[in-house]
């Protein structure tokens, strides 16, 4: 008798499952298809992104090779193309390299491209500071100290990645302008910063020694 009841129970369960399947099978299948499509789509996206990155890397290397061969105009054009079409990581590197290629034959043109990067709010703070410093390095011998100060002061703040170089450039610019007060300010800041690289600290100390003594009040 128990076996008969078991068979009846099993039949009831099968009938209930059949009803549930008949009622909800279309939803179950749809969910399964959506999961498969989502997984497939994500893997497809990952594949395409990896493919784009690999292509951009190869194109970047090819442009760098042109630069090594002193084909700067061709290299600049190649980096410009990458800056417009490559994934975001390579895009910024390409913009910086395009500016460097322009600077190799026209420093003012290179500085202008670096200034565009520095003014681009979509660019990270470190990249902006790097662009400011590279532009300033190109213009150090021709630009005024007030202009250099306006250009570089944001990069000199405590904790800024490139603050040491920015401070040294400002010290040199002030020195060139015979502004000993400003030169001393930046040299003192370089020497007093415990994280200043030793070679730069030595240069700053050498320049400090050449400054006239501070007048006693």
Predicted segments with their positions:
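N-terminal positive-inside, membrane-proximal cytosolic segments immediately preceding the first
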Residues: 1-34, 55
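Membrane-proximal soluble domains of inner-membrane proteins
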Residues: 1-4, 66, 191
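Short, low-structural-confidence N-terminal segments
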Residues: 23-26, 36-46, 216
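Transmembrane signal-anchor/signal-peptide helices with a preference for the extracytoplasmic
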Residues: 38-60
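Short extracytoplasmic
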Residues: 53, 58-93
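Soluble extracytoplasmic domains of inner/organellar membrane proteins
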Residues: 86-217
């Amino acid at each position: 008798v128990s076996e008969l009841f078991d068979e009846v129970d099993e039949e009831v369960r099968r009938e209930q499952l059949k009803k549930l399947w008949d009622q909800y099978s279309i939803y179950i299948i749809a969910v399964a298809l959506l999961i498969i499509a989502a997984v497939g789509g994500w893997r497809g996206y990952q594949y395409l992104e990896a493919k784009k990155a690999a292509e951009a890397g190869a194109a970047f290397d090819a442009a760098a090779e042109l630069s090594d061969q002193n084909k700067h105009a061709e290299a600049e054009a190649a980096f410009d193309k990458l800056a417009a079409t490559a994934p975001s990581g390579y895009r910024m590197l390409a913009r910086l390299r395009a500016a460097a290629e322009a600077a190799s034959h026209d420093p003012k043109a290179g500085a202008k491209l670096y200034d565009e990067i520095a003014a681009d709010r979509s660019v990270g703070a470190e990249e902006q500071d790097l662009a400011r410093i590279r532009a300033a390095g190109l213009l150090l011998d021709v630009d005024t100290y007030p202009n250099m100060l306006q250009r570089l002061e944001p990069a000199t703040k405590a904790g800024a990645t490139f603050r040491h170089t920015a401070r040294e450039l400002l010290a040199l610019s002030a020195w060139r302008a015979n502004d000993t007060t400003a030169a001393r300010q930046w040299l003192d800041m370089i020497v007093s910063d415990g994280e200043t690289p030793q070679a730069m600290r030595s240069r700053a100390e050498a320049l400090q020694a050449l400054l006239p003594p501070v007048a006693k009040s």
